[in-house]
């Protein structure tokens, strides 16, 4: 199922992949079930959200930092993305000559989704 960003979920989930950071942290903590896991792989909106430590330890939530994996991990991830028919949200696309405009949009926080640069 797909839910609107920030929408209340019908039930708590086993795991959350948190790649946004401060602006979505609270929603991620409230969305995961007791004993669930939050996997953090990015913090584009800031890396110092309110920690919500009380909720995390009372709910026995596991917080796991994640970076890059092996080539084999990446190959498995690509197969999963293809099989699950996942597509990123594209905010906008720019020619490489307009890269300054694209980065300006990111710096100003005027982005919902990915910014593409055509090379």
Predicted regions located by residue number:
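Short conserved AdoMet
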Residues: 33-34, 111
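Conserved catalytic-site loops of classical short-chain dehydrogenases/reductases
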Residues: 15, 36-40, 115
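Adenosine-nucleotide cofactor-binding segment
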Residues: 1-25
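Rossmann-fold dehydrogenase core element
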Residues: 34-39, 50-92
